[in-house]
Amino acid sequence: MKKIKREDKVMRSTIYISTLLILLVMNLSSQSIKVGDKAPDFKLPYATKDTIVFSGVSLSDLIGKRNIVLAFYPADWSGGCTTEMCTFRDNFSELSKLDAEVLGISGDYVFSHHEWAKHLNLQFKLLSDHKHEVAKLYNSYDENSGYNKRTIFIIDKTGRVAYINWRYDVRNPKHFEELQKALADLK
């Protein structure tokens, strides 16, 4: 009888330790970027209303020049994303006065970005992260839907994350106001 109890304890201990290890690994893999962290560098092709640049732009090339607004969004030509990008377009001069450069990032190809930017008359770059590598790096990719999550990051001139909105809501004007305030605080 004692032998069974000992084996039972060993089995429970093994299960307990295995469960803890699994939870630890899951926690480490789901850690996300925090305000104050160095922003992960990347290089992606992009389009504007005027051109397509296959050689791309890297975050490190932009650091030190202006504050960067990384706007991850699900897809070109969709309602919510159109609203979001038009908000950036309509407030472009104010964002420029706040020393900000907007970079929209989705999984769409640069050809779609180019046509959409022309259609909406967007003044900023739309980056093509077709394999979602950058979105995953920034914990802004939804595995279930296969699209980017709608998230906003501000990267300051030193290359640090200064602001994050994990659930940016295009229908909530306060979210854009918070973004503007965060940029104003960096001036």
Language model segments and positions:
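Thiol-/selenol-based redox modules, centered on thioredoxin-like
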Residues: N148-K187
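A short beta-strand-turn-helix
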Residues: K43-N67
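Bacterial N-terminal signal peptides that target proteins for export
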Residues: I4-S18
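Bacterial N-terminal signal peptides
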Residues: I17-N27
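Structural microenvironment flanking redox-active thiols in thiol-disulfide oxidoreductases
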Residues: T82-L122, H132-V134
